[in-house]
Amino acid sequence: MILDFHFHVAHVYARLGYPNAQHILGQRYLQGAGVEKNEDMAMHWFRQAAGQGHPHSSFNLAVGTLRNMTMALEEGEVEKLLSVAAAHGLLEAQQLLENIFKSRNLP
């Protein structure tokens, strides 16, 4: 019941454009917490929040793209998303970004 209420409140704020609420919805859909699991909807809300610079949504959208959970992004977009997340202190984003650059430099 409380999860339902929280989801509906977050949904209202997400539709109003609040990136934290958009991120919460993305997490809920990704995990199936209080709502039916839906990776497409998760990526939709992560994309909305990432578009406003939300670091965790940027990371989640980049990872979702790498795992083919969402449609492909423009070339270099994954790196941009990871850079946003890394600039906000997400160690996982920095490590993944380094791994991507290393893999490109292999013969």
Task: Provide a role label for each language-model segment.
Residues 2-9, 36-45, 71-81:
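Structural signature of tandem alpha-helical TPR/SEL1-like repeats
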Residues 13, 48-49, 84-85:
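Canonical positions in the second alpha-helix
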Residues 72-92, 101:
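TPR/TPR-like (Sel1-like) alpha-helical repeat modules
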Residues 3, 96-98:
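Intrinsic-disorder-linked linear interaction elements in eukaryotic regulatory proteins
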Residues 7-11, 19-27, 59:
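Alpha-helical tetratricopeptide repeat
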Residues 15-18, 31-33, 38, 51-55, ...:
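Short helix-capping/linker turns of helical repeat alpha-solenoids
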